[in-house]
């Protein structure tokens, strides 16, 4: 069975899978994989949020590809040059919501794994796919829930590739080997309401908040390290809720987010922010919520295999990066080593989201090359494994 990754991308775009709905995309992928001998489990969590775990069982190790079919809303339809859920090809580019993030990535790895299990070469090992419809929103019902289910069923993954759009300028220029953590803070400062003409009878909390936020913004959390940029804070909201211009408010709220590296800990960040607040006032309330923790996959043999695959197909020497936002790799790292690699991310979440047709084919070829060398290591690393024989299609592994 041969899958055209471009046609599959177009089909996936046609599903109006605005997060956390899949609109039939999960079932469509499962049907394709079942025809190729994969055992498929469609899992529903929460308010019928659908996920898929599919596995072609052929021993160990288990190489998994992961991704999400859900997309963010398209925004104003009038701003699109075509219907975001009716894929169109123009000048070698495929347009549609999810084209970059990340339906083309899913189509590429589905085409690659189907072709690999149906190919001429023999290999010892399993290939699986973990696909969710809840990456962009209700994360507790998506990949995180699937991994908990897998643990309960003693289903293991040895290595995972998340097909998120990691490339910046050209396909193959960036592999993500980790991600910064995200900690969101909410701060409320209290004061005493009063008339602006009698400030001595009131206590304006706005000045307290300004002082605290200034101190936080001026804080150097760290200077980064070999793998990570410095941790940094961005103030995202300030709200007084006061529409009266002669009234000193009784309270003020602010929100800010810290993207932190592996030098920091959540407890340490909270303690630092709390100390800054208490240095200004004792009348405040501070809370913190963490969505995804920082993680790092130390480069190893599998990273080298991906670097070689990218170079062979594109001629590009990829860089290893931890920049950018969070992803479900932050959950997967708790059960196995994980890297992220996929399409160019320039138009992700934007109006007129698009990807190159040529890049879809190249990404498929890169994934296929990785699969081949993951199970059939190249000569430079054959001495690291036990080879028990050779076939016309490559070494037969123990």
Curated annotation (Swiss-Prot):
Known cofactor(s): Zn(2+); Co(2+)
GO BP, sorted A to Z: diaminopimelate biosynthetic process; L-arginine biosynthetic process; lysine biosynthetic process via diaminopimelate
EC numbers for this chain: 3.5.1.18
MF annotations from Gene Ontology: acetylornithine deacetylase activity; cobalt ion binding; succinyl-diaminopimelate desuccinylase activity; zinc ion binding
Assigned keywords, A-Z: Amino-acid biosynthesis, Cobalt, Diaminopimelate biosynthesis, Hydrolase, Lysine biosynthesis, Metal-binding, Zinc
Cofactor binding notes: Binds 2 Zn(2+) or Co(2+) ions per subunit.
Quaternary structure, from the entry: Homodimer.
Taxonomic placement: Bacteria, Pseudomonadati, Pseudomonadota, Alphaproteobacteria, Rickettsiales
InterPro entries to which the protein is assigned, alphabetical: Bact_exopeptidase_dim_dom, DapE_proteobac, Peptidase_M20, Peptidase_M20_dimer, Peptidase_M20A
Bilayer-spanning residue ranges: none
UniProt name for this protein: Succinyl-diaminopimelate desuccinylase
Organism whose genome encodes this protein: Wolbachia pipientis subsp. Culex pipiens (strain wPip)
Pathway: Amino-acid biosynthesis; L-lysine biosynthesis via DAP pathway; LL-2,6-diaminopimelate from (S)-tetrahydrodipicolinate (succinylase route): step 3/3
Active-site residues, as the UniProt record annotates them: 70, 135 (proton acceptor)
Record has Cytoplasm as a keyword: no
Function: Catalyzes the hydrolysis of N-succinyl-L,L-diaminopimelic acid (SDAP), forming succinate and LL-2,6-diaminopimelate (DAP), an intermediate involved in the bacterial biosynthesis of lysine and meso-diaminopimelic acid, an essential component of bacterial cell walls.
Chemical reaction(s) catalysed: N-succinyl-(2S,6S)-2,6-diaminopimelate + H2O = (2S,6S)-2,6-diaminopimelate + succinate
């Amino acid at each position: 069975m041969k899958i055209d990754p471009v046609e599959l991308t177009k089909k996936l775009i046609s599903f109006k899978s605005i997060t956390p709905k899949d609109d039939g995309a999960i079932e469509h992928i499962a049907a394709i994989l079942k025809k190729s001998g994969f055992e498929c489990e469609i899992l529903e969590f929460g308010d019928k949020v659908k996920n898929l775990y599919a596995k072609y069982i052929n021993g160990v190790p288990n190489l998994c590809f992961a991704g999400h079919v859900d997309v963010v809303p398209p925004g104003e339809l009038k701003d699109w040059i075509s219907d975001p859920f009716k894929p169109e090809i123009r000048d070698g580019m495929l347009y549609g919501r999810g084209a970059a993030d990340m339906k083309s990535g899913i189509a590429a790895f589905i085409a690659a794994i189907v072709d690999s299990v149906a190919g001429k070469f023999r290999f010892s090992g399993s290939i699986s796919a973990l696909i969710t419809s809840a990456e962009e929103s209700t994360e507790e019902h998506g990949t995180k829930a699937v991994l908990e289910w897998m643990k309960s069923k003693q289903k293991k993954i040895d290595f995972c590739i998340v097909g998120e759009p990691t490339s910046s300028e050209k396909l193959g220029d960036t592999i993500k080997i980790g991600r910064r953590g995200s900690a969101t803070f909410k701060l409320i400062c209290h004061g005493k309401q009063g008339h602006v003409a009698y400030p001595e009878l009131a206590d304006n909390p706005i000045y307290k908040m300004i002082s605290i936020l200034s101190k936080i913004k001026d804080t150097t959390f760290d200077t980064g390290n070999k793998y990570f940029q410095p941790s940094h804070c961005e103030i995202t909201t300030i709200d007084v809720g006061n529409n009266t211009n002669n009234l000193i408010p009784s309270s003020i709220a602010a929100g800010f987010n810290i993207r932190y590296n592996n030098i920091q800990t959540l407890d340490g960040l909270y303690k630092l922010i709390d100390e800054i607040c208490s240095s200004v006032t004792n009348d405040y309330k501070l809370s913190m919520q963490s969505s995804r923790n920082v993680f790092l996959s130390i480069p190893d043999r599998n990273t080298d295999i991906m670097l070689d695959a990218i170079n062979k197909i594109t001629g590009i020497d990829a860089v290893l990066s931890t920049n950018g936002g969070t992803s479900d790799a932050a959950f997967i790292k708790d059960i196995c080593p994980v890297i992220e690699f996929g399409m160019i991310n320039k138009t992700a979440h934007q109006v007129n989201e698009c990807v190159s047709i040529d890049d879809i084919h190249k990404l498929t070829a890169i994934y296929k090359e990785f699969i081949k060398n993951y199970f059939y290591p190249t000569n430079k690393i054959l001495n690291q494994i036990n080879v028990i024989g050779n076939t016309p299609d490559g070494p037969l592994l123990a």
